[in-house]
C-alpha cells in the first residue's frame, strides 16, 4: 500500500510540474502578448489575401 501511495504522489508531482513548466515556457503560441504587453494580432488573425507574413 505504501508503494502505491508513493507512486500516486510521484505521478501527481510529475503532472503538476509539467503544467507549471508549461505555463512558464516562453512559447509565443501560448503567450499571445509581445514584450511590450501588446496583443500580437498576427497570432490570431492572418489575412489570406495578404500573403505570408
UniProtKB/Swiss-Prot annotation:
Sorted alphabetically, which keywords does the UniProt record give? Chloroplast, Membrane, Photosynthesis, Photosystem II, Plastid, Reaction center, Thylakoid, Transmembrane, Transmembrane helix
Q: Name one GO cellular component term.
A: photosystem II reaction center
Q: Name one Pfam family in it.
A: PsbI
In the bilayer, the protein is annotated as:
Single-pass membrane protein
Biological processes per GO annotation? photosynthesis
Cell compartment(s), UniProt: Plastid, Chloroplast thylakoid membrane
Q: Which domain of life is it from?
A: Eukaryota
Membrane-crossing segments per the record: 1-21
The entry sums up its family as follows: Belongs to the PsbI family.
Give the function comment from the record.
Answer: One of the components of the core complex of photosystem II (PSII), required for its stability and/or assembly. PSII is a light-driven water:plastoquinone oxidoreductase that uses light energy to abstract electrons from H(2)O, generating O(2) and a proton gradient subsequently used for ATP formation. It consists of a core antenna complex that captures photons, and an electron transfer chain that converts photonic excitation into a charge separation.
Quote the subunit structure annotation. Answer: PSII is composed of 1 copy each of membrane proteins PsbA, PsbB, PsbC, PsbD, PsbE, PsbF, PsbH, PsbI, PsbJ, PsbK, PsbL, PsbM, PsbT, PsbY, PsbZ, Psb30/Ycf12, at least 3 peripheral proteins of the oxygen-evolving complex and a large number of cofactors. It forms dimeric complexes.
**Would you tell me the protein name for this molecule?**
Photosystem II reaction center protein I
Give the classification, highest ranks.
Eukaryota, Discoba, Euglenozoa, Euglenida, Spirocuta
* Gene label: psbI
Amino acid at each position: 500500500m505504501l508503494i502505491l501511495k508513493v507512486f500516486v504522489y510521484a505521478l501527481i508531482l510529475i503532472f503538476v510540474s509539467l503544467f507549471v513548466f508549461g505555463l512558464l515556457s516562453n512559447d509565443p503560441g501560448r503567450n499571445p502578448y509581445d514584450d511590450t504587453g501588446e496583443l500580437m494580432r498576427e497570432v490570431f488573425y492572418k489575412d489570406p489575401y495578404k500573403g505570408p507574413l
